[in-house]
Amino acid sequence: MLPRIYLDHNATTRPWPEVIETVAYHLQHSYANPGSRHAEGRQARKVLESSRESIASILGAQPDEVIFTSGGTEASNLALFGAAHSMTHGTIALTAGEHPATIEACKSLKPHGWELALLPVDHEGRLLAEGVGSLFPSGPSSLGNADRLTVRSEKDSRPRSVRIATVILAHNETGVIQEVRPLTTICREHGVFCHIDAVQAVGKIEVHFAELGATSLAFGAHKFHGPRGIGGLLLKKGTTLAPFEFGGHQESGRRPGTEMVALAAGMAKALEMWLRERHERTARLSELRNRLEAGLLDRCPWAVVNGSREHRLPNTLNIAFPGLDGEAILVNLDLEGIACSLGSTCASGSAEPAPALVAMGAPPEVYKASVRFTVGLENTLAEMDDAAERIGRVIARLRG
């Protein structure tokens, strides 16, 4: 049997041994409820707040801007629902091809009076500079002292206020990295709540919350070798956010429930490890990804690399083999010992085409034949060569 090669690190990563040790230690020694006032509770609270401070420092935030959640999906839902229920309804502006955690949350708000408007992207999946101008007909430079940005309603010609905007920082399917500052700047100037989905970015590229200028930012530990079941939302100090869960005062009343101390400590440990080695890790991931990409294009020169090859995560390769079926490729690669995916694991089982590729204008023969390979630090160059050989063999067989 061929040895397995795991190339699905954007779906999840294996926790580092040091992270597992940290979680195990605090499960045993920091087991008390951090809300309790006795010595054991105070000790657990100390660990929780120390983890919060470490995470805040690494991500360019203040400790009281960190809200612990169960992961990135909950964090984005908390931001979007919390913002929507804290203000008068209007329009939510979102980039085409957002993660399901964002898209479905936004869609669920439509029955409550919210409308959606798409920010267009170019053929590489990057936000179009003129897209903001097309969404806001008056154009960013002519907004003057308007209280809100406005768009045309889906139902009539009356302008509707854009009150929330959301953008994905690094795309989970293509790895494309957005330049978000133009959007966050105009949102900040006109009082629009701006959320960033940074789940794929944190732990792969440098993320500084204050410098990005957003209102909120979501992240999840299992994407950067931390434990599953923990993530966070960075929320700008002073922002009103309505909770959508009830029953406790934890996380400043925004996320009730007994805090997961051991998991928070594990997440902080994973981020600390990334911080110490971030430059070496970025170089290593790029080397692995580029080796695999070169091997595949050498064997399949007609293949199409999706997204920007300049502005993308160092570990991500989304590639199409036009004329073939992505599902067939995926199944056959699994039989060949290659673990990869078609795109977002949160959308697995959906018959719909990858929204990110459709938004980029990819034709059906491309988006139906696309596969995502995401390398990790545990991979080797020898594995990349082996994987390219196996993948090339599968593609040749499927082409007949």
Feature names for model-found ranges:
Residues 1-400:
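Pyridoxal 5′-phosphate
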